[in-house]
Amino acid sequence: MPKLAVVLLVLLILPLSYFDVAGGQAAEGDRRGNGLARYPQRGGRDNEAECQINTPGSSWGKCCMTRMCGTMCCARSGCTCVYHWRRGHGCSCPG
C-alpha cells in the first residue's frame, strides 16, 4: 500500500479514538467548538449544569446540561467520563 494511502487511512481512523473501546459513545458537542455553551452561573441554571468558570468572579461559565468530560459534554446524563491513555477523555454511555 503506498505511503499516501496509509497516511489517509490513519487520518480517517483517528477520529474513532473518541469512542470508548467497550462500546461507548463519543462526546457530543455543538459542532461549532468544544461542545460547551455559555450560560449565566446565576439563577436555577447553575443547579442543573456542570460548569467551568471562565474567570474567577465572573457570572459566566461554560456549562453542560448533561455531564462534563474534560472540556466536552457527554451525550446523555447517564454517561461516565473515562480517560484513555494517549487519547484523552471520552464519554462511556450505557446501552
From Swiss-Prot:
Expression by tissue: Expressed by the venom duct.
Chain positions listed as propeptide in the UniProt record: 25-45
Self-association state and partner proteins as the record states: Hetero-, homo- or pseudo-homodimer (identical sequence, different post-translational modifications). Heterodimer of [carboxy'Glu-48', hydroxy'Pro-54']Ms20.1 and [carboxyGlu-50, hydroxyPro-56]Ms20.4 may exist.
Family: Belongs to the conotoxin D superfamily.
Modification 4-carboxyglutamate occurs at: 50
Molecular function GO terms recorded: acetylcholine receptor inhibitor activity; ion channel regulator activity; toxin activity
Domain comment in the entry: The cysteine framework is XX (C-CC-C-CC-C-C-C-C). Displays a mini-granulin fold, a structure composed of two short, stacked beta-hairpins connected by two parallel disulfide bonds. This newly described fold is derived from the same cysteine connectivity as knottins (ICK fold). The name 'mini-granulin fold' comes from the structural homology with the N-terminal region of the human granulin.
Top-rank lineage group of the source organism: Eukaryota
Cystines in this chain: 64-73, 69-81, 74-91, 79-93
Organism whose genome encodes this protein: Conus mustelinus
Modified residues (4-hydroxyproline): 56
Keywords attached to this entry: Acetylcholine receptor inhibiting toxin, Disulfide bond, Gamma-carboxyglutamic acid, Hydroxylation, Ion channel impairing toxin, Neurotoxin, Postsynaptic neurotoxin, Secreted, Signal, Toxin
The name this protein goes by in its record: Alpha-conotoxin-like Ms20.4
Free-text function comment from the UniProt entry: Alpha-conotoxins act on postsynaptic membranes, they bind to the nicotinic acetylcholine receptors (nAChR) and thus inhibit them. Through its two C-terminal domains, this homodimeric protein would bind to two nAChR allosteric sites, located outside the nAChR C-loop of the principal binding face and at the adjacent binding interface in a clockwise direction. This toxin specifically blocks mammalian neuronal nAChR of the alpha-7/CHRNA7, alpha-3-beta-2/CHRNA3-CHRNB2 and alpha-4-beta-2/CHRNA4-CHRNB2 subtypes.
Gene Ontology, cellular component aspect: extracellular region; host cell postsynaptic membrane
Subcellular location: Secreted
Signal peptide: 1-24
